[in-house]
């Protein structure tokens, strides 16, 4: 399982562009900058923070489907198992939006959580 990554600062930046840029009127701008699998996120965090315990195991899809019978909330992700959704953010980039890479967003978010003592 995975999802499209975006740094919250880039979401704010895109909101500002959407409010200020006349070419943004009437457009739907996607605030996402690349799909990444959870196992890739885990590997990235493990390399960046080797002293931290980062879960590396992934629940197999068959088990996720089985458990979703008992935990209905899991049902919402079943259609997305093994799907790498590619979203088109080119309209936003044409307006001058320059989001951070997924790697930068993940590492920055992790550092912030550590600095705040949350993890």
What residue ranges belong to the model's regions?
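Mid/C-terminal beta-alpha module of Rossmann-like enzyme folds, strongest
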Residues: 13-75, 102, 107-119
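Mobile gating loops/cap/lid regions near enzyme active sites that modulate substrate access
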Residues: 8-11
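Conserved C-terminal active-site "lid" loop/helix of NAD(P)H-dependent oxidoreductases
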Residues: 67-97
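A conserved pocket-lining segment of Rossmann-fold NAD(P)-dependent short-chain dehydrogenase/reductase
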Residues: 1-6
